[in-house]
Swiss-Prot record:
A zinc finger (C4-type) spans 249-277, 737-763. Residues 307-586, 606-934 form the ABC transporter domain. Forms a heterotetramer with UvrB during the search for lesions. ATP binds at residues 31-38, 638-645. It comes from Leptospira interrogans serogroup Icterohaemorrhagiae serovar Lai (strain 56601). PANTHER family: UVRABC SYSTEM PROTEIN A (PTHR43152:SF3). The UvrABC repair system catalyzes the recognition and processing of DNA lesions. UvrA is an ATPase and a DNA-binding protein. A damage recognition complex composed of 2 UvrA and 2 UvrB subunits scans DNA for abnormalities. When the presence of a lesion has been verified by UvrB, the UvrA molecules dissociate. InterPro entries: AAA+_ATPase, ABC_transporter-like_ATP-bd, ABC_transporter-like_CS, ATP_grasp_subdomain_1, P-loop_NTPase, UvrA, UvrA_DNA-bd, UvrA_inter. It holds the Pfam family UvrA_DNA-bind. This is UvrABC system protein A.
């Protein structure tokens, strides 16, 4: 069969559609946001592909995977096994890195274990093997009278009962062994748990250092070395000294090297992980800047919020500080910033030499005692360790930040592991390289002789994976980068590279906007990668809005014609050229140039004020100075990884939130920022969910639900029954269904199977009890209203201005199709961001608000971008300021001011390439953004000339 045939697809808003998708082709599904693209691609095609695969498994295997629901459709034929590559950043584990999720780090560990050269952690000298005489001499260096045990390690951290090993030791004539640090005699019956890791060392000899011991010592050392294949452990009662025939420092430093193995380089294994931070590379510690949120305040005013704001101990803490001030002779009403540095350090970290006198007088009691001053931070650390309350733990952690581990300096591994080098490069240095630099290192790595035979297959795997990652446009990422810090687009492209590396054939790949976060320059690489996946013999189905990807596809499906209830149909399907000529296709009109997002005729002058970021040097920023004019739409551009988000989110937003909004945020490294007096509020409108539970919805988030509940409470029927606004809330007792507690569904725990959700039988999913649902407005009860789309509700509430105004803002941002009570968890990142924008639009303007948006065009069609642009312009026209981080040229060309970062990503970025109005940026040759803007302005001029 040459195509995937779909008949009668009705999932979500799909209108009983029929569509044929050619197999082994690059197929793009496009259309307005909410038109049904994901419903077709993921909820129908992928879901059915997955379901059929699971159905083919045995009943035993299926019980662990659960029952998969069949999508609502009549027929689907020609389906291949389906793999979905979505935008979600799934790796929230702090131990996951780019290196681990791509499996490159697994091969690196193998490479360093097999061809790495160990060096002494103390002096850096290459480690050499020791002879028996050298080992004996090292033991003889212990002082006279020292009591030593000479041990031979035979099992090192391996699971099993090890009966045969213990039996052999017994037969060899030894009486004692040390098992997991405990001395045991072989006369007793030793039973080990087979699922637990065990270390076993033979006790070869126990000696006291004295004259004439050399001969006995040499014999014991030789015996130990034979039993353990070249390793001897000296136990002096306080620590173990590992000496090896294979590895020893020629300068005599005591080092703990065992045989090199891959687990030595794993920060997830106790054999490789730094013991201080357990391989995390950082420690959660109390931060001075978070504890003292406002240095302008004094101790009396509560500058140390964690003590001053404590409900239970606030009086005690303030009395402690008052006694300390009497002792150190400082005033409690002096602003924190004006106190001497030594005094501030004493207040925070304590001083055991200082004794505080306490004098508490109550109505019937009087306490007097003296106690050493503990200090704010030691006090909080002690209470943090002692608490068993999750809420208290969270409260403490709000004053804490991650700091690099003092032992491993953030490198995650033990110093012995960090001392192993391949061509003078330790493993931590390799992982600090960008993918592009690591690829270059591997290509130029020369190994010879026996090493070449061992390293060649390992290097081939590393080289392939690095090449695939570089090809999908993430060459600027480092292998040590935390997987949780990746954007959705970056995470998706990494998974895409992994799939290409698997070289599967006959698979249906379904991708969700892989171009997210990519500069136009890197799009060509991505399209080539998708074509490579197709050329392997796969069908590649991409939900995408990027023009270049559409034009390079083999087949284009345009969904619509509108969004939500107005969508769900196939407007047209064909080659990109055929779609661009279709008269009813909105996508076709934009592809052919018949419709365009307009370029503003005039740029804003701004209000004359600006924000000045001076000396920014967080991550890859190169100590740069940047001016952000206020009262304008400012767009930050640059290739992926050039430092845009670091500059705006990590430095500017965090600094402004701390200074202006008094939030507990820590800004990235910079010298200073000037101009905060020109703004009174800063709002980061990101793509995070509007709520974490199904109880959150657009009505609750935008504030619509309150006036709607008040309106219902004001109805005659509600007044007669004595119902207030709370009666119409599903979050509190009274009007909600108590069986499901207002959820409408019940969760049934299935233990080893996934939880099952069933509709509540009492309220039939309506969330409210019968009495509440009897109160109606225009024939509709509160449940009916929550089920309405924004578009329907706008007509329904046309006579209630406060509700209508909020609904109109949702319509303005193109969300007329969403339901008022739609669970927050069902919205895409782009939809969540536009709900937040609508909420801001409905507020009264102050004219001094700074808005920050990071890639707001994610998930948006050309037409959605045009609508979004109008909303952004409306907010700026009210006198506010806006900073947008964006790659979409339709937004960039509308900017009043552009800051272009680069020139490359990662180490090659972090500089300001150009600042100015769009037409000036277009003239700058070394600006990648400028090169693409130049094409747009040249094209627009040609069209305007033809029009004239």
């Amino acid at each position: 069969m040459q195509e995937i045939r779909i008949r009668g697809a009705r999932e979500h808003n799909l209108k009983n559609i029929n569509v044929d998708i050619p197999r082994d082709q690059l197929v793009v599904i496009t259309g307005l946001s909410g038109s049904g693209k994901s419903s077709l691609a993921f909820d129908t095609i992928y879901a059915e592909g997955q379901r059929r695969y699971v159905e083919s498994l045995s009943a035993y295997a299926r019980q662990f995977l659960g029952q998969m629901e069949k999508p609502d459709l009549d027929l689907i034929e020609g389906l291949s096994p389906a793999i979905s590559i979505e935008q979600k950043t799934t790796h929230r584990n702090p131990r996951s890195t780019v290196g681990t999720v791509t499996e490159i780090y697994d091969y690196l560990r193998l490479l360093y274990a097999r061809v790495g050269k160990p060096h002494c952690p103390e002096c850096g000298t290459p480690i050499q093997s020791m002879s028996i005489d050298q080992i004996t001499a090292r033991v003889l260096a212990f002082p006279q009278g020292s009591k030593l045990q000479i041990l031979a390690p035979v099992i090192s951290g391996k699971k099993g009962e090890h009966k045969d090993v213990l039996e052999k030791i017994r037969k060899d004539g030894f009486n004692r062994v040390r098992i997991n640090g405990e001395i045991r005699t072989l006369e007793e019956e030793i039973v080990l748990k087979k699922n637990f890791k065990t270390s076993i060392e033979i006790v070869v000899d126990r000696i006291v250092m004295k004259e004439g011991i050399r001969s006995r010592l040499a014999d014991s050392v030789e015996t130990a070395l034979k039993q353990s294949e070249g390793l001897v452990i000296l136990d002096d009662g306080s620590k173990d000294h590992i000496l090896s025939q294979k590895m020893a420092c020629p300068n005599g430093h005591d080092i703990g090297f065992t045989e090199l193995s891959p687990r030595m380089f794993s920060f997830n294994s106790p054999y490789g992980a730094c013991e201080t931070c357990d391989g995390l590379g950082s420690l959660l510690e109390f931060d001075e800047d978070l504890l003292v949120n406002d240095p302008e305040l004094s101790l009396v005013d509560g500058c140390i919020e964690a003590w001053a704001g404590s409900k239970s101990n606030g009086f005690w803490f303030m009395a402690t500080l008052k006694s300390l001030s009497d002792s150190l002779k400082f005033k409690m009403n002096t602003p924190w910033k004006d106190l001497p540095e030594k005094t501030r350090q004493t207040i925070l970290y304590g001083d055991k030499k200082i004794k505080i006198e306490y004098d508490f007088r109550g109505a019937n009691s009087h306490y007097e005692f003296t106690k050493e001053y503990e200090g704010v931070i030691p006090n909080l650390q002690r209470r943090y360790k002692e608490t068993k309350s999750d809420s208290m733990r969270q409260w403490f952690e709000s004053y804490m930040t991650n700091h690099p581990c003092p032992s491993c300096k953030g490198k995650r591994l033990k110093r012995e592991s960090l001392s192993v080098k391949v061509h003078n490069v330790p493993v931590d240095e390799f992982t600090s390289y960008s993918i592009e630099k690591a690829l270059n290192f591997v290509q130029n790595l020369k190994v010879t002789g026996a090493e070449e035979i061992i390293a060649k297959p390992i290097l081939k795997e590393i080289h392939q994976r690095l090449s695939f990652l570089n090809d999908v446009g993430v060459g600027y990422l480092t292998l040590e980068r935390s997987a949780g810090s990746l954007s959705g687009g970056e995470a998706q492209r990494i998974r895409l590279a992994t799939q290409i590396g698997s070289r599967l054939m006959g698979v249906l790949y379904i991708l969700d906007e892989p171009s997210i976060g990519l500069h136009q320059r890197d799009n060509t690489k991505l399209v080539s990668t998708l074509k490579n996946l197709r050329d392997l013999g796969n069908t590649v189905l991409v939900v995408e809005h990027d023009q270049e990807t559409m034009e390079e596809s083999d087949w284009l499906i345009d969904m619509g014609p509108g969004a939500g209830v107005h969508g769900g149909s196939i407007v047209c399907a064909g080659t990109p050229a055929e779609v661009s000529k279709h008269k009813n296709s909105l996508t076709g009109k934009y592809l052919s140039g018949r419709l365009k997002v307009p370029i503003p005729a005039k740029l804003r002058e701004g209000n004359g004020s600006k924000l000045q970021i001076i000396g920014a040097k967080e991550n890859n920023l190169k100590n740069i100075d940047v001016n952000i004019p206020l009262g304008k739409l400012v767009v930050i551009t640059g290739v992926s990884g050039s430092g845009k988000s670091t500059l705006i989110n990590d430095i500017l937003y965090n600094a402004a939130a701390h200074k202006v909004m008094k939030m507990k945020t820590l800004a990235g490294k910079h010298k200073t920022i000037k101009g905060f007096e020109n703004i009174d509020k800063i709002i980061n409108i990101d793509q995070s969910p509007i709520g974490r539970t199904p109880r959150s919805n657009p009505a609750t988030y935008t504030g619509l639900f309150t006036p709607i509940r008040e309106m219902f409470a004001g109805l005659e029927e509600a007044k007669l029954r004595g119902y207030g606004p709370g009666r119409f809330s599903f979050n509190v007792s009274g009007g909600r269904c108590e069986t499901c507690e207002g959820d409408g569904i019940l969760k049934i725990e299935m233990h080893f199977l996934p939880d099952v959700y069933v509709t509540c039988e009492v309220c039939k999913g309506k969330r409210y009890n019968q009495e509440t649902l009897e109160v109606r407005y225009k024939g509709k009860n509160i449940f009916d209203v929550l089920e309405m789309t924004v578009e329907d509700a706008n007509q329904f509430f046309e006579n209630i201005p406060i509700v209508k105004r909020k609904l109109e803002t949702l319509l303005e941002v193109g969300l007329g199709y969403i339901r008022l009570g739609q669970p927050a968890t069902t919205f895409s990142g782009g939809e969540a961001q536009r709900i937040k924008l609508a909420t801001e639009l409905s507020k009264r303007p102050t004219g001094k608000t700074l808005y920050i948006l990071d890639e707001p065009t994610t998930g948006l069609h050309f037409e959605d971008v045009r609508r979004l642009s109008e909303v952004l312009h409306t907010l700026v026209d009210r006198g506010n300021s806006m900073i947008v981080i964006e790659h979409n040229l339709d937004v960039i060309k509308q900017a009043d001011w552009i800051v272009d970062m680069g020139p490359e990503g990662g180490d090659g970025g972090g500089l300001v390439i150009a600042e100015g109005i769009p037409k000036d940026i277009a003239k700058i040759k070394n600006s990648y953004t400028g090169q693409y803007l130049k094409k747009i302005f040249t094209s627009s001029e040609k069209i305007s000339r033809k029009t004239k």
